[in-house]
């Protein structure tokens, strides 16, 4: 049976991950640790014999720079890359820039968990005159007002990620190309929910660690057979637990 592999990588730790702040579409860069995580992901992929024909990422530098570091370790810096806003992190609305633990102290752990992980729950909206509104950013100049979010739930994130998967990424896999996607915690959760047909309760508890390659294997009908992380299982579990705890009061 022919097996097709897809590699997903959540960006390495960002400066705002390190400061435990809601990031969303705010364009922060990787922290020093995040750069190291991205390089380590590349080394793991190289050790396992992976190479690629095409890469996808978002238009946010923490994902772009993660991909650069991964490809550099693979000696594939030349690889063609498509960047799309549809792979951006979920837009966190008026929460963007706020400290997660301080927000939990103000609103309660459960409310923040729902904002972070609830399937159809949207954080408080930005107004369009807010400097954080993506309509003020030149990289989104060609998008319509209807496409530009003022806040997003995971359900709304799925509404942009899944069509992009089906219309753009999946056809490339079906053509036989080897693909890597470097994206974000929630855009990847959106894709994982779709691929694994996960329920809303299941996705609430799913946390994707930073900078760890997640490999999906598909059968000849492009149905997922299995998926697994590359690396030390205990370390990966600890990183996923740390992601889950970010939204709790101190």
UniProtKB/Swiss-Prot annotation:
Tagged with keyword Isomerase: yes
Annotated site residues (Transition state stabilizer) in this chain: 184
Superkingdom of origin: Bacteria
Residues that bind substrate: 10-17, 23-24, 62, 89-92, 100, 116-117, 185-186
Catalytic activity of the protein: (2R)-2-phosphoglycerate = (2R)-3-phosphoglycerate
Pathways involved: Carbohydrate degradation; glycolysis; pyruvate from D-glyceraldehyde 3-phosphate: step 3/5
Active site: 11, 89
The protein's Enzyme Commission number: 5.4.2.11
InterPro entries associated with the record: His_Pase_superF_clade-1 (IPR013078), His_PPase_superfam (IPR029033), PG/BPGM_mutase_AS (IPR001345), Phosphogly_mut1 (IPR005952)
Complex formation: Homodimer.
Identification of the protein by name: 2,3-bisphosphoglycerate-dependent phosphoglycerate mutase
Species the sequence originates in: Klebsiella pneumoniae subsp. pneumoniae (strain ATCC 700721 / MGH 78578)
Taxon lineage: Bacteria, Pseudomonadati, Pseudomonadota, Gammaproteobacteria, Enterobacterales
């Amino acid at each position: 049976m022919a097996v097709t592999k897809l590699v997903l990588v959540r960006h390495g730790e960002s400066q705002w991950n390190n400061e435990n702040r809601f990031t969303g579409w705010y364009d922060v860069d990787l922290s020093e640790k995040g750069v190291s995580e991205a390089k380590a992901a590349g080394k793991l992929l190289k050790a396992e014999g992976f190479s690629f024909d095409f890469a996808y990422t978002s238009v946010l530098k923490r994902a772009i720079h993660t991909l650069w570091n991964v490809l550099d370790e693979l000696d594939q810096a030349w690889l063609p890359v498509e960047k799309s806003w549809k792979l951006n992190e979920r837009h966190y609305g008026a929460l963007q820039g706020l400290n997660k633990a301080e927000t939990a102290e103000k609103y309660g752990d459960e409310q923040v968990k729902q904002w972070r992980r609830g399937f159809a729950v949207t954080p408080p909206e930005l107004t369009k005159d807010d400097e954080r509104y993506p309509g003020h950013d030149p990289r989104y100049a060609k998008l319509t007002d209807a496409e530009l979010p003022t806040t997003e739930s995971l359900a709304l994130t799925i509404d942009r990620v899944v069509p992009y998967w089906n219309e753009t990424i999946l056809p490339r896999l079906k053509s036989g190309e080897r693909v890597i996607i470097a994206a974000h915690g929630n855009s990847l959760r959106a894709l994982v929910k779709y691929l694994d047909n996960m329920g809303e309760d299941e996705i609430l508890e799913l946390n994707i660690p930073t900078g760890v390659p997640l490999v999906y294997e598909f059968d000849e009908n492009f149905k997922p057979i299995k998926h697994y992380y590359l690396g030390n299982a205990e370390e990966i579990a600890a990183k996923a637990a740390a992601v889950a705890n970010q939204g709790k009061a101190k």
